[in-house]
Amino acid sequence: MGKVLDGKTFANLLGQNLKEKVKKLKDEGITPHFCVINIGDDPASKIYVRTKKRRAEKMGIIQDIYQMSADTKQEEAIALIDKLNADPAINGLMVQLPAPKQIDTDALIERIDPNKDADGLTPANIGHLWMDKHFVEPATAEGIIALLKHYEIPLEGKNVVIIGRSNIVGKPLAALMLEQNATVTIAHSRTKNLGEITKKADVLVSATGQAFLVKADMVKDGAVVVDVGMNHVDGKLVGDVDFDNVKEKASYITPVPGGVGPLTVQFLMEAVVKLTRRQNDR
């Protein structure tokens, strides 16, 4: 039976350290200031934004939420980003995804000043990520690497399979896994014989948003299984992995909730503080 990788407890441990860093900044008259732009009425997005705000407050970070209507025009969102980019009091900035169909989210992300890019998703920061010269990284990917290191799970020379090729999780996680000298395979919706590929994984990460996609017969004995999925089934939050059955085969496994999710929020806060320190030559 696999050991559960407790992301929530680890996130709280990191939070204690981050609060101390924020306190030291405040003692010098510097308070990290973070802005989230949320466009539209997506219920899940509103929950995520509130979760970030609660975490920011706990860390001592100021977080402003800019809630824009579902009929917001592209130029209105661009104008807000330009305003926040130009404001020296703002240290970190992100656009909550998804956005309404009329919004070109790639263009919004490209508009963010890379020095204020808390999500690490601007082309400049993604480029630095692939060149191993990164300063901030997409939070979920960074959180996964940190969690595996926390539990002293080796990655060098391991076969890592990532299901999902998003710019937010799959691709940046592949870059960070390569940096750890893992051998990386990315699978996706067009991948054939998925189970044959996943059974070769020493570390299997699923980030698809498909409930119970990963079954026990797709996992080799002793594999490390990381579940990034967040899906609602019958009123319950579940992951991409059939947890109860896969747990019997895995050596380590993350739960949903309480696994990767808390670390995503925590590492977003870590990024805001890193950006704040750099902007103030700390």
Curated annotation (Swiss-Prot):
One Pfam short name: THF_DHG_CYH
GO molecular function: methenyltetrahydrofolate cyclohydrolase activity; methylenetetrahydrofolate dehydrogenase (NADP+) activity
Amino acids binding NADP(+): 164-166, 189
Catalytic activity, EC: 1.5.1.5, 3.5.4.9
Kinase in keyword set: no
One GO cellular component term: cytosol
Reaction(s) the record says it catalyses: (6R)-5,10-methylene-5,6,7,8-tetrahydrofolate + NADP(+) = (6R)-5,10-methenyltetrahydrofolate + NADPH; (6R)-5,10-methenyltetrahydrofolate + H2O = (6R)-10-formyltetrahydrofolate + H(+)
Listed SUPFAM superfamilies: Aminoacid dehydrogenase-like, N-terminal domain, NAD(P)-binding Rossmann-fold domains
Self-association state and partner proteins as the record states: Homodimer.
Family indicated by similarity: Belongs to the tetrahydrofolate dehydrogenase/cyclohydrolase family.
PANTHER family, per the entry: C-1-TETRAHYDROFOLATE SYNTHASE, CYTOPLASMIC (PTHR48099:SF5), C-1-TETRAHYDROFOLATE SYNTHASE, CYTOPLASMIC-RELATED (PTHR48099)
Protein name per UniProt: Bifunctional protein FolD
Name of encoding gene: folD1
